[in-house]
């Protein structure tokens, strides 16, 4: 599946560490969920960080500790401490650290909208549903508003990860 299959077009986003958040912000503005003046990576970074911070039980089991369970001298199960969790949330909010699955899920829930990540791998569309699991109302049938972004690994051959905004083609 590609953008053309979905009658969409791709718009490039600067691969600067904020690309995921910038792509989602753009789509939220296109869908009328955020005013264009507020559709910035800083706003979506803050939304993701705040959601994760206020819902630690939904995220802590999936976030590895700084040292990891296999790190030299590690004696714990590899989970973040409360202090590390706070540092992690602050980094998501205030730095250009890359976002991933936890941040996409947080954005989907914070804005109560499915987020589809289109990629070249399997599965071709990764659905993040605010309810937590894909269901019949996840936007795959085209009847519901959905944020669509495309994931590109090493798009420029430099090893970076980029997200591209997927917008409906306007006729």
Please give the residue ranges for each predicted region.
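Structured partner-binding subdomains within large eukaryotic complex subunits
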Residues: 118-171
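Papain-like cysteine protease catalytic cores
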Residues: 1-127
């Amino acid at each position: 599946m590609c953008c053309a299959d979905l009658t969409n077009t791709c718009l490039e986003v600067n691969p600067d560490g904020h690309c995921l958040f910038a792509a989602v912000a753009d789509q939220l503005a296109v869908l009328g969920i955020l005013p264009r003046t507020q559709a910035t990576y800083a706003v979506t970074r803050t939304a993701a960080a705040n959601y994760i911070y206020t819902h630690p039980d939904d995220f802590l089991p999936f976030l590895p500790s700084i040292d990891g369970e296999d790190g030299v001298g590690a004696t714990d199960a590899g989970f973040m401490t409360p202090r590390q969790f706070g540092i992690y949330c602050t980094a998501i909010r205030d730095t250009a650290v890359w976002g991933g699955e936890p941040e996409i899920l947080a954005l989907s829930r914070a804005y109560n909208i499915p987020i589809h990540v289109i990629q070249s791998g399997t599965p071709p569309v990764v659905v993040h549903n605010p309810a937590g699991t894909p269901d019949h109302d996840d936007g795959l049938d085209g009847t519901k508003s959905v944020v669509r972004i495309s994931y590109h690994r090493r798009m420029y051959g430099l090893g970076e990860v980029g997200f591209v905004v997927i917008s409906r083609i306007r006729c």
